[in-house]
């Protein structure tokens, strides 16, 4: 596992990467949340895990699979978005926060202020933030600049014809922009890396979950949206993406994430308060084992290469 110390600063969506979602920390192991409070003979240790919707499906599978390995441990997984998970961690309400973005410097400071503990981050895998259109949309590739023109406040593209796309059988080619809510790490990553931290245009369809974004795009001929690459369905098309006009366009894939050619590749994180120990450490070690990484691989995300994984 690649550990990132802070400076100032199921199988339904399975596919290839995902790494962050069900882990916790016993109160006696230096973490917050509810872990270990169930204790006692015959009772399970409960690990509370909350955060990134991108990772929630893989986290649920991890929890199920780990329950077969460690039947005395129960991992309770919930989504809500990276920001929601981190906020819960900062209050000591959960043991593990999942995030598809880096923790912000102010969040690190808030954790220390609230709990007296420094957050510990773990990169547990990689994802490509894919751009989706309806399967019948003739568009096959797009540039980051074109995406900004579509999604950013002040961007000039409001109709498909303005970027040279004509959708057969569509009279009104107004672009339906499908986005995420502001508590989402996916939203923040897209805003930073595509919009250059500009505001989004008003009038987009802002949804709670990654799956919901893809479902809406798959049911709307004129829609475009963004979500983790593991959420693709036959109803949508993943666009190739180029960093700028004239540059090569790359499909979001394991290969393009691994060789860093895809412009919107990102790391996925687990965050704990303080160093993970005891049952939590064992759970993280299991996630980074062949068994845990197989779940990641089957989830549509990019697992940590075997040579880069720590030995338990």
Language model regions located:
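Short, low-complexity disordered leader/linker segments with a strong preference
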Residues: 1-45
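Exported/periplasmic ABC-transporter solute-binding proteins
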Residues: 29-127, 132-312
């Amino acid at each position: 596992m690649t550990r990132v110390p802070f400076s100032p600063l199921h199988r339904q969506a399975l596919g290839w990467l995902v790494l962050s979602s069900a882990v916790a920390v016993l109160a006696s192991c230096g973490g917050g949340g509810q872990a270990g409070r169930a204790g006692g003979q015959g009772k399970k240790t409960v690990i509370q895990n909350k955060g990134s919707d991108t990772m929630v499906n893989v986290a649920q599978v991890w929890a199920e699979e780990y329950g077969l390995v460690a039947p005395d441990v129960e991992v309770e997984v919930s989504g809500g978005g990276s920001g929601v998970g981190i906020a819960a961690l900062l209050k000591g309400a959960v043991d593990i926060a999942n995030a598809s973005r880096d923790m912000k410097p102010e969040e690190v400071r808030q954790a220390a202020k609230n709990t007296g503990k420094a957050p510990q981050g773990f990169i547990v895998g990689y994802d490509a933030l894919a751009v989706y259109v309806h399967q019948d949309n003739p568009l096959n590739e797009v540039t980051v600049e074109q995406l900004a023109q579509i999604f950013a406040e002040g961007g000039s593209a409001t109709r498909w014809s303005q970027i040279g796309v004509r959708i057969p059988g569509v009279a009104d080619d107004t672009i339906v922009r499908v986005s995420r809510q502001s508590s989402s790490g996916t939203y923040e990553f897209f805003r930073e890396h595509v919009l250059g931290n500009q505001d989004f245009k008003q009038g987009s369809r802002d949804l709670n979950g990654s799956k919901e974004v893809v479902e809406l795009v798959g049911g709307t001929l004129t829609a475009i949206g963004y979500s983790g690459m593991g959420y693709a369905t036959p109803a949508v098309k993943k666009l190739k993406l180029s960093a700028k006009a004239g540059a090569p366009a790359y499909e979001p894939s394991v290969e393009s994430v691994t060789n860093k050619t895809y412009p919107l590749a990102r790391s996925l994180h687990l965050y704990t308060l303080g160093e993970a120990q005891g049952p939590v450490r064992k759970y993280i070690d299991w996630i980074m084992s062949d068994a845990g990484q197989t779940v990641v691989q089957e989830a549509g995300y990019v697992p940590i290469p075997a040579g880069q994984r720590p030995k338990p």
